[in-house]
Amino acid sequence: MGEDQTALLNSILKDINIPTARELIDLHKEFNADNYAPNRDEISKRLIAPPYRNSEENLKLKGRAGEPELRQLYINNLIKKTKFKYSVETQTGETYNHTNNNGNGRSGNIDLTIYSPESKKGDLKNLVNIEFKFCTPSAEELKRDITKLVKEKKIDGILYLSLINSNKSTIPKILEKLRKVFLPLEESKDFSKIADNKLVMIFIVVLETTYIYHNIFDFNRAKDNFDKYCEDFFVPSKFSISKIPKIKK
């Protein structure tokens, strides 16, 4: 089962994640770089990066290629390149406790859920849950997203992060935040159940540098020494790193 799950995530990486990153970069450059000719297909070109108000914090950026645009491009590629079915803002099967709900568990929403092509009413075959994040997320935001991705039983997850820019410390800091989010998961009372055959892909795209970073966290491999696995996993050298090539016409 593990090999099939890894193959599925890698096919999504190739067919959806990377093409989406390429188009998001193209959208960002179209609306923020001078004399840049967009190079997306005709469907993706119809998506516009809405203008920012002329406020001081956004003087350097003219158009937003943010989380809503990321999700739209992702769905476009899912439709164009796969047979998967999908839902948006999918209610979670589990309940979660956050600081603002008085300690009572409540359902959350998953940004996007991918189902097998054979799924139908009354017989949904959930394959992957996806959470999108734009700009550098806080530790609390990461905790909420990772909790939802991990605790939904028998469904793998993808955390898709989009950053405008980065320096040499940006990626290490994000990975360290993620390490601190993952570590307490081992103390969950139902850890053995939620982590059984669970995979979570971490995918990061940086719009200005056009680099992508990705790796798959394998809970089965992590079980024997969870602390050590987390320590070894959440470092840039363990991630596949590549520069996104330009879109070919």
Regions found by a protein language model. Name each.
Residues 135-154:
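Mg2+/Mn2+-dependent nuclease catalytic core
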Residues 112-118, 125-136:
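Conserved catalytic cores of phosphodiester-cleaving nucleases, focusing on short active-site segments
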Residues 35-101, 121:
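Acidic-basic catalytic patches of nuclease active cores, encompassing PD-(D/E)XK
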Residues 1-33, 68, 249:
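Nuclease-adjacent, charged terminal/linker segments that flank catalytic cores
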Residues 164-249:
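Domain-level recognition of nuclease-like catalytic cores that cleave nucleotide substrates
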Residues 5, 63-70, 105, 138-141:
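Phosphate/oxyanion-binding active-site loops and adjacent basic polyanion-contact surfaces
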Residues 128, 154-164, 198-202:
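Hydrophobic beta-strand segments of well-ordered beta-sheets in folded domains
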